[in-house]
Every structure is written in structure tokens, then in C-alpha cells.
Amino acid sequence: ILVQTAPAGPIDVLIGRPALQRPDIAPRHHAPPHRAEREAVEADRSRRTAGDGWGFAGLRQLPAHAGGQHQQGREGQEKASGRRHVRCHIPLCALSVHTTMHTHALSGIATDGHRRFRRRHLCRPRAS
């Protein structure tokens, strides 16, 4: 990235303001303070859903404790759209998991889920 540094003018020198912060060199765009945080979250999400093969990002965002509960609505939507299976989120496993197995397939850390479906999967339960 080429940063254009203008020579500091007399007022800038007086104030001790670096050339880059001068108003005549406008920053590309003023982001609200929460934007960096939001981008970090999105980057993390895309990292977790990368290689998913389905591009179904929203489903992965279940909290770890949501394992045992019935994920109402999510399954219904999927069945309506004709998608019965999703990919396992565990690296190197990548097996197709039925949408009812949300614990295993979709939550970020569902240790009991791993243990429960270990037979049917290449993945190992996380060491606790």
C-alpha cells in the first residue's frame, strides 16, 4: 500500500502533528468503532465454515451448550429446503451428518457430541 506522506506544514510542526494525520490527506473511510470487532467475528466465522462445502454459515453459530437441546426451526428450515445432511465441522472428518445431529455436526465444541457419534465418524472426541 502506497501511503502518501505530505511534507508537514508550519502549523503541523507547531502542533506536533504527524503529516499522516493532517486533514488534507483524508483517510479512506471513517469506520464506526464496532466495525473492527464485527470484522473479527466475521473472519472467525468464515475460518470455521471454510471447507464446509455447503456454505451454510449460520448453522454453525450454535453455542457449545446448545448441544442437547432441540434446535427448533433450524432443522425445519433445512428440511423445507430439502437439505437433510450437513458436513461435520471437525477438520479431517468432513463426513455428512444428518441435520438432527446438531450437537456433533454444528456446534463449535460439543465434546459429548463427538463421543456420541464417534462410531460413525473418523473424528475423535476432544481430550478433556
From Swiss-Prot:
Membrane-spanning parts: none
Which reaction equation describes what this protein catalyses?
Answer: L-histidinol + 2 NAD(+) + H2O = L-histidine + 2 NADH + 3 H(+)
Looking at the record, which segments are called Disordered? 21-84
The GO biological-process annotations, alphabetized, read as: L-histidine biosynthetic process
Q: Name one GO molecular function term.
A: histidinol dehydrogenase activity
Q: What is this enzyme's EC?
A: 1.1.1.23
Pathway it belongs to?
Amino-acid biosynthesis; L-histidine biosynthesis; L-histidine from 5-phospho-alpha-D-ribose 1-diphosphate: step 9/9
What protein am I looking at? Putative histidinol dehydrogenase
**Which gene produces this protein?**
hisD
